[in-house]
């Protein structure tokens, strides 16, 4: 292990728990560090902290006392959701204490190759696609990272034959130093998490940290459909392999409805197991990674054809009386909803949209709304979504929440229609996260059956 000497007998502060914090604390303890865990949730309501204390790890809960950092910590490992303007983080940085996320630990604790996937949309689907295709091609792959499996836990179980396929957020990448994937994928870049990063440029810079330790023997896979992503191609030492649905590139591309890798036919686009132009892009990125790692064409084709998608990401839920239901609750921005709509005949679609009001106008979405059968709108942003619907000349129905919206959409649907939850907004005005929102949609579908 590369990091035993870094942490053994050193004091390390783990700031914030959740899955990644617990994983980091346990790994550091195992490696001989003197670990302190600090979490804002009160101890009596914090079963994870209770479990760590039972196992001999020091825990301080209920607040984040700045005086804690008067101790001689050699390292802070923070939860990626904790911002860099947090007073604890600011004090640590001011004292010269390195601030990592558990992704850095994962890299240092294992010698297996890493495929890292980042971007604004499509990360989870592409990460899952890549892992499934690699496994189908007898290249053992382990999913980890932002997809829900802490990288530092999974890395400890990896064998020499494995590849870690790691979904990476900008928050996670900001807390890395030596992290060095063999292949990095950038799915796309749109303005996201500006409240965290401050500017789009800072957001892109955080994403681009994925490649800063890479060399010419490594590969960066970039979406050449996007100007913002394409511009990064000249800013890396790694070998760039592009993908595109708009032009023939020296990588993976779409031409005449077929997918190719450097001139080699892989499969027809309509064979991909999930709909939408965005999933063609996700498949092309997957094809690049698979070919770079030696997976044959047949395994790629069979795996992508069988791919069933990921929960809350244009997930086909089922049919009731000939009406199809799709759960795309993960679509928390305009681009994601545009991509979702691109896979369907608008005249058959009843779109459920709306959510947290971030002040966005939805003019960019108007061309994609034209021709929709109807829209069901809800949430804080409903008035803004209504204005976009008016411009697209689409009739709307207002709903109180997702359950109400789902029932109202089904009530007006006819055989052959599609009820699509693709909100184009975050969920936090009504729901804790997009997963909870999507689960309400799924539960209502079951009740309607």
Swiss-Prot record:
Family matches, as Pfam families: Mur_ligase_C, Mur_ligase_M, MurD-like_N
Domain of life: Bacteria
Group of enzyme by EC: ligase
InterPro entries: Mur-like_cat_sf, Mur_ligase_C, Mur_ligase_C_dom_sf, Mur_ligase_cen, MurD
Reactions listed under catalytic activity: UDP-N-acetyl-alpha-D-muramoyl-L-alanine + D-glutamate + ATP = UDP-N-acetyl-alpha-D-muramoyl-L-alanyl-D-glutamate + ADP + phosphate + H(+)
Cellular compartments per GO CC: cytoplasm
Identification of the protein by name: UDP-N-acetylmuramoylalanine--D-glutamate ligase
């Amino acid at each position: 292990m590369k990091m035993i000497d870094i942490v053994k007998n050193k004091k390390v502060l783990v700031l914030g728990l959740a899955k990644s914090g617990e994983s980091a604390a346990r790994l550091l303890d195992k490696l001989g560090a003197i670990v302190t865990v600090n979490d804002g949730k009160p101890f009596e309501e914090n079963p994870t902290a209770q479990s760590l204390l039972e196992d001999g790890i020091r825990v301080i809960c209920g607040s984040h006392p700045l005086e804690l950092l008067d101790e001689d910590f050699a390292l802070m490992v923070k939860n990626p959701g904790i911002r860099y303007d947090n007073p604890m983080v600011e004090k640590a940085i001011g004292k010269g204490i390195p601030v990592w996320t558990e992704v850095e630990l994962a890299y240092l604790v294992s010698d297996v190759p890493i495929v890292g996937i980042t971007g604004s949309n499509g990360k989870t689907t592409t990460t899952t696609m890549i892992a499934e295709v690699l496994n189908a091609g007898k290249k053992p792959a382990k999913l980890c990272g932002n997809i829900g499996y802490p990288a530092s836990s999974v890395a400890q179980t990896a064998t020499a034959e494995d590849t870690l396929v790691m979904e990476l957020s900008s928050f996670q990448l900001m807390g890395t130093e030596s992290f060095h994937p063999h292949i990095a994928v950038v799915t796309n870049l749109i303005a996201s998490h500006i409240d965290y990063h401050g500017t789009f440029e800072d957001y892109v810079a955080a994403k681009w940290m994925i490649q800063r330790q890479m060399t010419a023997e490594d590969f960066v896979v970039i979406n050449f459909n996007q100007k913002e992503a394409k511009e990064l191609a000249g800013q890396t030492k790694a070998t760039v392999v592009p993908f595109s649905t708009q032009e023939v590139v020296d990588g993976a591309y779409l031409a005449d409805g077929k997918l190719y890798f450097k001139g080699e036919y892989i499969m027809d686009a309509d064979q991909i197991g999930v709909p939408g132009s965005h999933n063609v892009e996700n498949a092309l990125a997957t094809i690049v990674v698979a070919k770079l790692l030696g997976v044959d064409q047949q395994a790629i084709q069979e795996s992508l054809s069988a791919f069933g998608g990921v929960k809350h990401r244009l997930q086909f839920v089922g049919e009731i009386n000939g009406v199809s239901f799709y759960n795309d609750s993960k679509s928390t921005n305009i681009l994601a909803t545009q991509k979702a709509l691109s896979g369907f005949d608008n005249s058959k679609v009843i779109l459920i949209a709306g959510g947290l009001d971030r002040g966005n106008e939805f003019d960019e979405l108007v061309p994609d709304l034209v021709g929709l059968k109807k829209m069901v709108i809800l949430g804080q942003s409903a008035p803004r979504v209504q204005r976009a619907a008016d411009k697209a000349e689409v009739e709307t129905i207002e709903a109180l929440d997702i359950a109400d919206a789902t029932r109202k959409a089904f009530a007006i649907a006819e055989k052959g229609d599609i009820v699509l939850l693709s909100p184009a907004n975050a969920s936090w005005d009504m729901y804790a996260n997009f997963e909870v929102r999507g689960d309400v949609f799924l539960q209502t579908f079951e009740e309607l059956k």
